[in-house]
From Swiss-Prot:
Enzyme class: ligase
Listed InterPro entries: BRCT_dom, BRCT_dom_sf, DisA/LigA_HHH, DNA_ligase, DNA_ligase_AS, DNA_ligase_CS, DNAligase_adenylation, DNAligase_N
GO biological process, one term: DNA replication
Protein name: DNA ligase
Sequence positions that bind NAD(+): D35, S36, V37, Y38, D39, S84, L85, E116, R139, E176, K293, K317
Keywords: DNA damage, DNA repair, DNA replication, Ligase, Magnesium, Manganese, Metal-binding, NAD, Zinc
GO terms for MF: DNA binding; DNA ligase (NAD+) activity; metal ion binding
Gene3D superfamilies: 5' to 3' exonuclease, C-terminal subdomain, 6.20.10.30, BRCT domain, DNA ligase/mRNA capping enzyme, Helix hairpin bin, Nucleic acid-binding proteins
This protein's encoding gene: ligA
Active site, renumbered: K118
Length: 670
């Protein structure tokens, strides 16, 4: 289909506007529109590109996300090695660095240095050809890194196409990938809620995010890139000074740290260092010192390199923000998803101006690796200047009777069994629905759209019901009384009636939805449908052995153990029986009969008229098929609805059968 000239012009205009706003946000730090307006522009572009897929280009802002997961990172040879810097830790060492340079150049007078914050992130090389990003690679050992292009494309601050026209034929931009402190804290909070692994500090988070085999995971991480150096350069001469290189970066749309300063001589470097020592905690990301570079690129070339580091640059590291204290106790906290976390209770100590009396030990693998015990004198650090953590014990000061901490066999809150699956770092309480520590999130999950879908039972109302002790476990939802609800603040009769109607309506559900609502770790809606299709009845599933569960497609040993442990916890069985007694019910799952759908894999793209996406996927699963979210060579059918996305084009390219809604409904009837 030919793209109307007016549409093509609008698409190009949208791309330009979005790229300009990215530039203003990430490079100039001067956003001119609110996020909501930016989102509207982005969604309009997405919609037009879906309708006219032939207009999509690799450098379009919409093409940052969506690549298939990788099996392995390809090695990348650095034509110019990515060397590390030598370090100094005091004024004497810095002055010695300056003296060596001036002696080598036979200069008595001071000359210009460029001072920059030393970012505590992950080094990254970006290669642009004719302005287009063609490759991104990690430092690795300095000579060989890993190709992380697909992941890097998802980082919003990395331009897929350089701005303007005054860029070289080929340029390698080196810099650092960071996770800002605010984004790091938010990521860890959300990971804790989901029961996922948290990161110890922003640097680990940035590194782990950049090295995900699935770019879609990287896309969800709050990463930012700052450029600081040019490696390869073809088709353009180097400028006179390093600060001119940084100006190039800004002109091309590459973010550069604003705290960079050109100083005259080593005294200026020392002043800059003292300034950053005082202001480092106000910065949005972690730094662990300053980097000092000779400003003149000609002088840099004269000085050259020694071993694995340049002679013309040095890192002046900050003193470690660590203190010693004593572990008074090690207690266990239970998270909302049952994760049991060891926490060290400490003799209060001031670290970076903050009194620290508690510090996370992250998980039991970390606890045993560090071998921290009650009574130990330990080194405490504020990880990322924010989260207190125990670095490790000073073994020479360990009391003779200090004992190794054991994983608790029972939950400190509900006294249910605590299990630590082989290969996992975390231990979990299997108390599930009965454990009060997990109650709040369990209720929210139980009422969510893909579960029992109780309209109106939102987060704030759940908090209020628990606070007022109207709900003590999930069964309490079905025992709420109108009089008790209307007695609450801002809850009138109409609101109470609407909520009770929604609760009553939720009693009629399906077995897959009920299984998903129970919140068993590892059992999402797809696994829930698989279990319902396999067992047909809840009783049979509750009696299934771990071995039987492992024989089912898509269920591995860890999920099988989670399911078995959940149903064999007495409290969970009692709560399930009580829910059924209170009226929660579902039609019996029918055994899958032989059909055109059985054994086939389906992907949906676009909107269907007669079914929601969830309903269509449920019908596929109940007919013996499998519904997946991405197109691959293993896909049998792609169901094409209104306004299909890129999956439609990919299916056409792979020669996969495309069917419309009418054909899909006929298959269901077969």
């Amino acid at each position: 289909m030919e793209v109307p000239a007016k549409i093509q012009k609008r698409i190009e205009r949208l791309r330009q506007e979005i790229n300009d706003h990215n530039y203003r946000y990430y490079v100039l730090s001067q956003p001119t529109i609110p996020d909501s307006v930016y989102d509207e522009l982005f969604h309009e572009l997405q919609k037009l590109e879906k309708k006219y897929p032939e207009t999509i280009t690799p450098s379009s802002p919409t093409q940052r996300v969506g690549a298939e997961p990788l099996k392995v990172f390809e090695p990348v040879h650095h034509e110019i090695p990515m060397l590390s810097l030598d370090n100094v830790f005091d004024e004497k060492g810095l002055r010695a660095f300056d003296k060596r340079i001036r002696q080598r150049l036979k200069l008595d007078k001071p000359f210009e240095y460029v001072c920059e914050p030393k970012m505590d992130g992950v080094a990254l090389s970006l290669l642009y050809e004719n302005g287009e990003l063609i490759r991104a690679a990690t430092r690795g050992d300095g000579y060989t890194g890993e190709n992380v292009t697909q992941n890097t494309r998802t980082i919003a601050s990395v331009p897929l196409q350089l701005r303007g026209n005054d860029y070289p034929e080929l340029v390698e931009i080196r810099g650092e990938v960071l996770m800002p402190r605010e984004g790091f804290a938010k990521f860890n909070r959300e990971a804790e809620k989901r029961g996922d692994k948290t990161f110890a500090n922003p640097r680990n988070a940035a590194s782990g995010s950049l090295r995900q085999l699935d770019p879609r995971i990287t896309a969800k991480r709050p990463l930012i890139f700052y450029g600081y150096l040019i490696g390869l350069l073809k088709g353009k001469d180097f400028p006179k000074n390093h600060c001119d290189v940084l100006k190039w970066f800004k002109d091309w749309g590459i973010p550069v740290i604003s705290e960079i300063k050109v100083v005259g001589g080593i005294e200026g470097c020392l002043d800059y260092y003292e300034h950053l020592v005082k202001t480092r905690e106000k910065m949005p990301f972690d730094i662990d010192g300053i980097v000092i570079k000779v400003n003149s690129l000609q002088v840099q070339a004269e000085l050259g390199f020694v071993s694995r580091a340049p002679r013309w640059a040095i890192a002046y590291k900050f003193p470690a923000q660590e203190k010693m204290t004593v572990v008074k106790a090690i207690e266990f906290q239970v998270g909302r998803t049952g994760v049991v976390t060891p926490v060290a209770r400490l003799e209060p100590v001031s670290v970076s101006g903050v009194t620290v009396s508690n510090a996370t030990l992250h998980n039991f693998d970390e606890l045993y690796r560090k071998d921290v015990r009650v009574g130990d004198t330990v080194i405490v650090r504020r990880a990322g200047d924010v989260i207190p953590e125990v670095v490790g014990p000073i073994l020479a000061k360990r009391p003779k009777k200090a004992k190794l901490i054991k994983i608790p066999s029972r939950c400190p809150v509900c006294h249910a069994e605590v299990i630590k699956p082989e290969g996992e770092a975390v231990a979990r309480c299997v108390g599930g629905l009965y454990c009060r520590a997990q109650l709040r999130e369990s209720i929210k999950h139980f009422a969510s759209r893909r579960a029992l879908d109780i309209e109106g039972l939102g987060d704030k109302l759940v908090e209020l019901f628990i606070q007022e002790k109207l709900i003590k476990d999930i069964t309490g939802i079905y025992q709420l009384k109108k009089s008790a609800i209307t007695a609450l603040p801002r809850m009138g009769e109409k609101s109470a009636e609407n909520l009770l109607t929604a609760i009553e309506k939720s009693k009629k559900t399906t077995l897959p939805r009920f299984l998903y609502a129970l919140g068993i770790r590892g059992v999402g809606d797809t696994i829930a449908r698989t279990l319902a299709r396999h067992f047909h009845e809840l009783d049979l599933l509750m009696k299934a052995s771990i071995e039987t569960l492992q024989e089912i497609r898509d269920i591995g040993p860890v999920v099988a153990e989670n399911i078995h442990a959940f149903f064999h916890q007495k409290h969970n069985a009692e709560l399930i029986n009580k829910l059924i007694h209170l009226g929660v019910h579902w039609p019996q799952e029918k055994a899958v009969v032989k059909s055109e759908i059985a054994g086939k894999t389906f992907v949906l793209t676009g909107a269907l008229k007669s079914l929601t996406r969830e309903e269509a996927e449920e019908k596929i699963e109940r007919s013996g098929g499998k519904a997946t979210s991405s197109v691959s060579k293993n896909t049998d059918y792609v169901i094409v609805g209104e306004n299909p996305g890129s999956k439609y084009e990919k299916a056409k390219a792979l020669g996969i059968s495309l069917i419309d809604e009418e054909a899909f409904l006929k298959l269901l009837k077969s």
